[in-house]
């Protein structure tokens, strides 16, 4: 079975280094002229799939914006996932789950088991209970060709108080996460399947992110304040592994399909220039 790292590497080579989020929050639904209900949610998601599903390497639905409508919202999420995969995009479900034992194993089955209606290519997870507690998620990903993105250095300013705190051994909490994920990805070619979430807004990290040997999801671009040019400052020699993530910067162009595509093309061009220097 082909690994997620290999599939992501190929998707980026074919479609370019870009992840676009699907974040149907009330303000954006209103901007699109849609009601803040499950029907508006469905129209929003279907439009994004139509516009971007066959041209963007990775699409990242934010699960919370679907879950807030209960079972009907989750049904829309299931449909969105199916449509995106049929269109050829890799689906990264933003859930930021984190737990222990049988519970994290259940999360792994929900998102990474091919028979699940919520089966996606990769998920985001939180390491606050310890990176080792996420082992069932990593194991399922390895067995089923899935991917996992672990929060490390996030774009929200509140994160620094925890992530840059130092452990008894002198390493920052973020460095502990980086080191453990680096070990998981050791020797993987062309890219490991366990990635990190590293915000594009955080400036120089002081960490060797190239050693991770896995994909580096970079949120915080566009509406959150970072530009594609900031990627060079944050990631340095790790630029080849960076997957820039935009949401509002692209989605604000909707609901017109052509405008959404043009917005995605524009930020992709910015990302290519920043990542390659051309």
UniProtKB/Swiss-Prot annotation:
The active site is at 96 (proton donor). The keyword Lyase applies. Its EC number is 4.1.1.23. Keywords: Decarboxylase, Lyase, Pyrimidine biosynthesis. Pathway: Pyrimidine metabolism; UMP biosynthesis via de novo pathway; UMP from orotate: step 2/2. It is an enzyme of class 4 (lyase). InterPro entries: Aldolase_TIM, OMPdecase_AS, OMPdecase_type-2, OMPdeCOase_dom, RibuloseP-bd_barrel. GO terms for molecular function: orotidine-5'-phosphate decarboxylase activity. The keyword Lyase applies. It holds the Pfam family OMPdecase. It catalyses: orotidine 5'-phosphate + H(+) = UMP + CO2. GO terms for biological process: 'de novo' pyrimidine nucleobase biosynthetic process; 'de novo' UMP biosynthetic process. PANTHER family: OROTIDINE 5'-PHOSPHATE DECARBOXYLASE. Belongs to the OMP decarboxylase family. Type 2 subfamily. HAMAP family: OMPdecase_type2 (MF_01215). This is Orotidine 5'-phosphate decarboxylase.
């Amino acid at each position: 079975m082909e690994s997620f790292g290999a599939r992501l590497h190929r998707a980026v080579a074919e479609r370019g280094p870009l992840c676009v989020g699907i974040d149907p929050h009330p303000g954006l639904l209103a901007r699109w002229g849609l009601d803040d209900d499950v029907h508006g949610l469905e129209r929003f998601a279907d439009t994004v799939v139509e516009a971007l599903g066959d041209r963007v390497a990775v699409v990242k639905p934010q699960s919370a914006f679907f879950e807030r409508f209960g079972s009907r919202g989750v049904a829309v999420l299931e449909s969105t996932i199916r449509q995106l995969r049929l269109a050829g995009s890799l689906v990264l479900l933003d859930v930021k789950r984190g737990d222990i034992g049988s519970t994290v194993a259940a999360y792994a089955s929900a998102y990474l088991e091919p028979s699940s209606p919520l089966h996606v290519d990769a998920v985001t997870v939180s390491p606050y209970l310890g990176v080792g507690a996420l082992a069932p998620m990593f194991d399922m990903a390895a067995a089923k060709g899935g991917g996992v993105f672990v929060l490390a250095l996030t774009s929200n300013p509140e994160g620094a108080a925890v992530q840059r705190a130092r452990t008894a051994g002198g390493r920052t909490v973020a460095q502990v996460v980086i080191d453990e994920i680096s070990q998981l990805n050791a020797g993987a070619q062309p890219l490991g399947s366990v990635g990190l979430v590293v915000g594009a807004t955080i400036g120089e990290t002081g960490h060797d992110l190239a050693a991770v040997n896995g994909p580096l999801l970079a949120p915080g671009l566009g509406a959150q304040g970072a530009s594609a040019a900031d990627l060079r400052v944050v990631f340095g020699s790790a630029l080849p592994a960076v997957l820039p993530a935009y949401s509002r910067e692209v989605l604000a162009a909707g609901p017109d399909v052509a405008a959404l595509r043009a917005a995605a093309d524009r930020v992709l061009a910015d990302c290519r220039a920043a990542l390659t220097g051309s």
